[in-house]
Every structure is written in C-alpha cells, then in structure tokens.
C-alpha cells in the first residue's frame, strides 16, 4: 500500500494554503477545492437554468453520491439515505423503531453521543429504560458484559463507535456479533469513524449506521448519510413522510422499500453534490491509506504532548483514533481553544453535554481535543506543540 501524497492533498485544499493549522476534523474538516467547485457548479446551474430545471442534473449527482457512499461502506446504494445531519438521521431511525413502551430496554455504551441520548427522552417518558453497558478494564464497552444483560425486553443496542471526547475505538464488530446472535436491533453512531478508518457494515452486523458529511469525509455542513440494512427496513416506520418517502400509488401513499423512506423531497442538490465529490475522493484515496496516515500523525502528537509538563491525556482503550483529548493544567479547555485560535491553530473543546455519561463517570468538566486529517504535516504538529508550550509558560 503506497503512502498518500500529502503535499498534493494540501495543494488541493484551500484551507491549507491560507495559513490555518487545522486540527479539528472531529468537528468539521477542511474541504477540497473540488468539493467546493461541485457545490458552486450546482448553485450556478440553478441560478442560470432555474432551480427546478437544474434539479434534474442535481438528482443525477445525488445518485452518484449514493453509489459512492455504498462503495465506502460496503453496502448497496439502495441502503443509503441522505439527511441534513447525523443527529437527524439517528433520531429518525430511532423514532421509526417505536412505538416504545413501558419495560422496553435500550442498552447504550457509556460514551454515547449526547444528541442520541436526547432523542431517547420520548421513549423514556413512555416507560422505556436506558441502561449503560459496563466497560472493560481499558474503558471500552464490554461485549461480555453486554451478553449478560440480554433478555426479552431489550429492544435496541446502540453504540457510539468512536467517542467525541477521546481516542477510544469501541469494539463495534464484537458488539454486533452479540446483537446478531440474540436478534436485537443494533445502531452505530459512526460520526467520527466514516472517512477516518475502514467501515464495513456487513462485518459490523449493524442494522443502522449514520455519519455526518462534515467530519472526516470532508464534505459540507448540512449533509449526512445513513445506512439501513435492507432486511431491517420492515421494522422501521418513519413518522415523517412526504411524496418522496411515501409516494402515491393506486392504493394510496406507500412507504418506499429502500432507505430513501428517510429522505425528503426538498434537499440541497448543491450540498449533496459536494458530499458526493468528498465521498468519491475518499474512495479514490483509499480509506485504508487515510487511516494509516491518521495513525502515524496522531501517534506523533500524543508522544509530543506527553513531553509537555502539565498536560494530561484522556485516552481510553488499547487502540486509538485520530482524536486526542487532553487538558493543560491551569487552563480552561474552551479558553485554550480560543487562545490557540488567535494563533490560527484550530482545535476543539467539549463540555459534559456531548458525552455526558462518560464525562460524569470520569469527573471531567471539559476537555480540549486535537483531531487529525491526512493532510496535516510535521509543520502543523510543530506549530501546535510550540504554541502549547508558549501558553504553558
């Protein structure tokens, strides 16, 4: 496997030419010029030819994007839906699995995304219980403990694969094997995974998987994708419907028999054109090569951070993603983010709300987070470390 041409990636990314050091793809990544061009081209077509008329060309691009997403996830194109955000995708699938009732059990990892937990509130009000799967000694969700929790009342197993507050990689495939063995629906929040590391929905044994377009896929904001296993569609009854998701037939309005039952007829073809280009770029580069590069860069950053007095890392697990969570003694994480931003170095910062169960369990009020892209280079790392040393002093 040949390494990525990092210089070419940087030259094809306007943000890398602007003087910004971007260590925040876990929030949103820098798009390529080609992705920007795809968005602008569709908008220009709408302005020139008429929005509805240009929609025919846009629809072709959306189907091209759907095939690219299927290729990336090892899924049929018909199993892919596009939505406006990852949280929207997850919430729609969760609500469609209802109705929820008293006694239903929802098993989640301790690192669950806060937005997903918020979407469960309606089920909780109906009498369902959200229960946390115990972690193993490394801090990862434990498949053995999960297996011991299973009974006839478990209606959903839900896992955030790569948490937003650290480098943990949860054992998504092993969790999926437990779910499959017991015949329990299994949802994966892969918002931090898709575009960063290889994702094979067949190997994961998941029924639903979602990801935002703006993170490691390097697509535009306002886009997301969702995989729905074809054989699982019959168990999902979306509350929100329109003429696309439930088209008119001689017998009345009928839900589609593919993942597009979760789409709406009103979409931004321009944004989806950009997402489509980003998906094609990920496929061309090869996510295995992207992941190899991310592992190399993040290992160097972790090593450098450990050498700075006053910095504490918050990694769990044995293998780590390209997200490095840390704190610098004497600094609020959000103020640290702001001060680095003044030096044109972008990082992230999280409070409790994004991953409340894990943050509370570890007594963390906030964390600073550095996340990496394949286009980050040695100069980026040097700038980050030098700035942190300067602020510490």
For the regions a language model picked out, list residue spans one by one:
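Pyridoxal 5′-phosphate
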Residues: 1-393
């Amino acid at each position: 496997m040949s390494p990525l041409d990092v210089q070419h990636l940087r030259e094809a990314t306007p943000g890398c030419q602007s003087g910004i050091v971007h260590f925040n793809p876990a929030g949103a990544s820098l798009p390529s010029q080609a992705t920007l061009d795809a968005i602008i081209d569709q908008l220009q077509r709408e302005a020139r030819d008429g929005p509805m008329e240009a929609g025919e060309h846009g629809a072709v691009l959306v189907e091209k994007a759907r095939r690219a997403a299927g290729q990336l996830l090892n899924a049929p194109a018909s199993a892919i839906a596009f939505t406006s955000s990852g949280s929207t995708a997850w919430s729609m699938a969760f609500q469609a699995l209802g109705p929820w009732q008293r006694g239903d059990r929802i098993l989640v990892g301790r690192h669950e995304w806060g937005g997903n937990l918020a979407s469960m509130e309606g089920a909780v009000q109906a009498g369902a219980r959200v229960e946390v799967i115990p972690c193993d000694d490394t801090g990862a969700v434990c498949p053995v403990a999960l297996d011991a929790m299973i009974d006839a009342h478990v209606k959903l197993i839900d896992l955030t694969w790569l948490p937003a507050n650290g480098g943990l990689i949860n054992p998504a495939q092993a969790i999926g094997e437990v779910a499959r063995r017991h015949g329990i629906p299994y949802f994966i929040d892969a918002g931090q995974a898709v575009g960063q590391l290889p994702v094979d929905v067949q190997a994961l044994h998941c029924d639903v998987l979602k990801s935002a377009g703006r993170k490691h896929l390097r697509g535009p904001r306002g886009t997301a994708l969702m995989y729905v296993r074809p054989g699982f569609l019959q168990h999902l009854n979306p509350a929100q419907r329109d003429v696309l998701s439930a088209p008119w037939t001689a017998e009345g309005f009928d839900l589609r028999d593919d993942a597009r039952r979760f789409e709406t007829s009103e979409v931004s073809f321009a944004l989806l054109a950009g997402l489509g280009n980003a998906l094609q770029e990920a496929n061309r580069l090869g996510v295995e090569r992207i992941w190899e590069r991310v592992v190399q860069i993040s290992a160097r950053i972790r090593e450098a951070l450990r050498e700075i007095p006053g910095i504490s890392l918050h990694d769990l697990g044995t293998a780590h993603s390209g997200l490095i969570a840390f704190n610098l003694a004497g600094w609020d994480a959000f103020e640290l983010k702001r001060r680095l931003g003044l030096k044109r170095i972008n990082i992230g910062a999280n409070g409790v709300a994004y991953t409340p169960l894990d943050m509370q369990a570890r007594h963390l009020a906030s964390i600073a987070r550095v996340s990496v892209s394949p286009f980050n280079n040695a100069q980026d790392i040097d700038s980050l470390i030098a700035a942190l040393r300067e602020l510490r002093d």
